[in-house]
C-alpha cells in the first residue's frame, strides 16, 4: 500500500491524542491532519487545523484525497452543558464530518465508541453511542472499524476528573492486564486504543473487498492488536 493521508478528530482527548500519535508514528502515512478547537503542543509532525467554531470543521477538511478518518470526537454531559448539547457533538458533529469525509473520497473510518453501546439501551449514554455506530455504518464507508474500549486508563489532558471517574480508573488499574482483567471488561490504556485503531485500519485497508466491511474491536482484541504490533516492531 502506498503512503496515505489521514485525518484525526478528537485529538484533545485521551484516545484521540494517541490515535494522532500512532498515525504520525506510522510509516503508512505520509501526511496526518488534525482538526481541533485548540492547538496540540504534544505533537509536531502533523498538519494542525485549529478553529474554535466546530460548525465550520466540515469545510476545513483537507481538499486532497485522504483515505483514512480516525475519530474519537466526544465530550461529557457536564462539559457540554447537558445531554442534548453532548449529543450534538458526539453524534451530530461526528456524523457531519464523516459524511463530508466520505464525499471527499475517504474510504476507511475508525470510530472510538464504548463497550455496551446499544441503540436500544435504557442508558442515554450507551444509547447515544449505539446510535452513532448505526448512523456511521449506514454511510457505507469501504471499511468501518468501531473500537469499543472498556475502562479507559491513562493521563487525560482535558481534566476529565471527579470522584466517580477517579475511583473507576483506580479499580481499572488494579485489574489491568491481570488474570482477573475480564471482570472489568479488559481495561485498556488510551495509548493502546490509539495503536489498535491505526493497526486495525491498516489491516482492513489491505483487504480487497467489493462490499463495505464493518469490524468491531472490543477491549480484549485491542490488547491483542497492541501485543502483535509490539512483537512485530
UniProtKB/Swiss-Prot annotation:
GO-annotated cellular components: mitochondrial outer membrane
Keyword Mitochondrion among record annotations: yes
InterPro entries, A to Z: Him1/Fmp52, NAD(P)-bd_dom_sf
UniProt GO BP: import into nucleus
Compartments, as annotated in UniProt: Mitochondrion outer membrane
Domain of life where this protein originates: Eukaryota
Record flagged with keyword Transit peptide: yes
Keyword terms, alphabetized: Membrane, Mitochondrion, Mitochondrion outer membrane, Transit peptide
Topology versus the membrane: Peripheral membrane protein
Family indicated by similarity: Belongs to the FMP52 family.
Identification of the protein by name: Protein FMP52, mitochondrial
Organism: Candida glabrata (strain ATCC 2001 / BCRC 20586 / JCM 3761 / NBRC 0622 / NRRL Y-65 / CBS 138) (Yeast)
